Structures are given as C-alpha cells and as structure tokens.
C-alpha cells in the first residue's frame, strides 16, 4: 500500500520571498533609543527592525552584529515616521500613530502599548502620517501628513488637543524652533508655514517657489525637507535647497545641487542634506560643498544623528532610503559599514 506524499513547500521559497522583499525595500524612518545604544528603522512593508549600535560598533563585531536583533510587524502599510521619548518608541503609518515601550522591545516583546488616530473629517479617510515631532516643553506630539493638517496629541492623556489648518495639500515635514514655541511645516503646496503654539495660529508663510533664485518649475513646488536653528531655516524639495533668514523671510544661500533633497539637518557649523543620489552632502553655511560622502543606497530619505550623551561610543550618523541597508558613518567623512534588514 502506497502512502500519499504530502505536498511540500519548495525548499528555499521563504528565502526567495525575503530576498525579493529586501530588493524592493525602502527604509523611510529611523529613531535612536533613549540610551543611545539601539537604532529602530521602519520600512515600506510596515516592519520595524531594531539594531544594536553598540554591538555593530564593537571591536569584536561580526557580520551577524549588523543584522536586526529583532524585527516586528508594526503597521499594515509603510512606517513613514518614528520618534523616541525617554521611554517610548512612537511610529506612524497610514492614519494612526502607535506607542511601543523601548524596554519591552529590547526584551523582544513587541506588543503595541497604544494606538491613536487623529480626528479626521470622515471615517473613510485614512491619510498617511508623514511626520512626527515631539514638543518637550508641553509634553506633546505633533502629527502631519495627508489630510493637510497638524494634529497635536497630549502624550500624557493620549487626547488630541488642536488641529492647525492652512496647508492646501499634504504635509511632508515638520521642525521645531526650540527657543520659541513655534513649529514649521513644509508641504506639497510649496509653502513653509510657521505656527505659534501659544495661540494655535499660523504667523508666517514662505512660498519658496515664488522666489526666482529658489524656483525650479521642472521639479515642482513641493517642500520635502526642512530644519531650523533659531533665526535660520533650511528647506528643499522641488525648489533648490536654500538657507533662509526667518525674521526677514529672506533667502540668503542657495546651495548648488540639482537633485531634489529629501532630508536636511543642522550639525555644528554644517548643514547635512540627502535625497536623490547616494551621497550625504556636507555644506558650509556660505553654500560651499565641503564633502559628498557616498553611501550604499541609490537614494536617501532619512538621516539620523545619534547624539545621546549616555552613549558617546555610539555617536554616529546613519542614513537610509531606497534599499534594505542603513549606512553608518562613524565620522562624517566616510561610511564605516551598513546595517541590513
């Protein structure tokens, strides 16, 4: 009597699927743990991977040290943005933000602590949340994205306390002016808007594309990245990457780079930017290109500077984008190695 042979899953099918996933992966977001020793990276499949920076940077590091210590499914769609508080990792996807305890994640217990959805205009609306911003002085979180509004959430109660309206198209990016309670937002409508949190109103608008020296009509008017340092702001996207004096709404430096930039940050006396192309660009405030440091991804979407004082040995710049890798720069001048999903 012959026994029926059970249908077997072809050997290697799971590995082929994982290889295809990695091939088509985009890493949208990063966040460093409060202790500074771990890095969270969120991808287009809704996964968050946790890497041990301390293990990867160790003199005894092996290839395995550059792989995630844990990977978990966080959202049904892409993980567009992440930030960390002193205890929590906050992640945003389509229509909602979730909270996770760092202590539990590191024990590999990846159950969400809570989830919140901003009060959208209709129950059918599920807009992406492109940007998260912590406002430490008021213990709040600002969310912005596809519904063209900035929503403020009280981190203690989990309630949404205000919605700021003014953008006419979806919002890409947020930045905080720490010395004054003001938030900047940049969007697809080509405007950077400044909001005074004390009065919950828009107090300044800069329509970047209307300034001839910044305008690049062939790239569009969208603002994809911005950063602020007291009276100064740098922003880019469709228009050229430009340094602005905020009080006078004046563009002071237009940086000579053709590729649209997707992330920008101030660092010491430099401006770091990245976007289309594999390089992290180091700019003097005068507009001079000090360095272009190549990475392993064909396009970059996120830069993260780990400056946690608790872990000076993990002080690195990490860059991610259109690949399954997170490049690690141990000094700003070269890529030391890459972490990989």
Swiss-Prot record:
**What protein name applies here?**
THO complex subunit 6 homolog
Q: Which residues carry this modification: Phosphoserine?
A: 180
Report the main location listed first in the record.
Answer: nucleus
List where in the cell it is found: Nucleus; Nucleus speckle
- Per the UniProt record, the source organism is Rattus norvegicus (Rat)
Note the segments forming the WD repeats: 22-61, 74-112, 124-163, 166-205, 215-254, 256-293, 295-339
Please provide the record's keywords in A-Z order.
Apoptosis, Developmental protein, mRNA processing, mRNA splicing, mRNA transport, Nucleus, Phosphoprotein, Repeat, RNA-binding, Transport, WD repeat
One GO CC term, this protein: transcription export complex
Quaternary structure, from the entry = Component of the THO subcomplex, which is composed of THOC1, THOC2, THOC3, THOC5, THOC6 and THOC7. The THO subcomplex interacts with DDX39B to form the THO-DDX39B complex which multimerizes into a 28-subunit tetrameric assembly. Component of the transcription/export (TREX) complex at least composed of ALYREF/THOC4, DDX39B, SARNP/CIP29, CHTOP and the THO subcomplex; in the complex interacts with THOC5; together with THOC5 and THOC7, plays a key structural role in the oligomerization of the THO-DDX39B complex. TREX seems to have a dynamic structure involving ATP-dependent remodeling.
